[in-house]
């Protein structure tokens, strides 16, 4: 599956999770979008998605997701500054 199609599916998953107030799904979708956008070199947008994932994980008490989002946020932010 190509990256654009995958991004479309993840964005739809985010919409559905939001409509259903499924916070764990929202944070997971933001993480996936961040990873996809990092791979495309869109570090500015990916850091925003990682930040959203981190905040939602913090709200829901999901420590593992919060830590993963922090790491990805830091890596994308560093990559953005290097380019």
For each of these PLM feature ranges, what is it?
Residues 1, 16-22, 40, 56-64:
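Short coil/turn linkers that connect adjacent helices within long alpha-helical scaffolds
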Residues 9, 26-37, 49, 66-69, ...:
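TPR/Sel1-like alpha-solenoid repeat signature
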Residues 11-12, 52:
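Alpha-helical solenoid scaffolds in eukaryotic proteins
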Residues 43:
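Conserved tryptophan-centered aromatic signature that marks the ligand-binding surface of SH3
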Residues 47-83:
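C-terminal non-catalytic interaction modules
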């Amino acid at each position: 599956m190509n990256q654009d199609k995958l991004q479309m599916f993840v964005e739809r998953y985010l919409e559905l999770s939001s409509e259903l107030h499924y916070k764990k799904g929202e944070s997971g979708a933001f993480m996936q979008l961040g990873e996809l956008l990092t791979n495309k070199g869109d570090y500015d947008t990916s850091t925003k998605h990682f930040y959203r994932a981190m905040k939602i994980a913090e709200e829901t008490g999901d420590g593992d997701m919060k830590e993963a989002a922090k790491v990805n946020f830091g890596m994308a932010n560093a990559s953005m500054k290097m380019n």
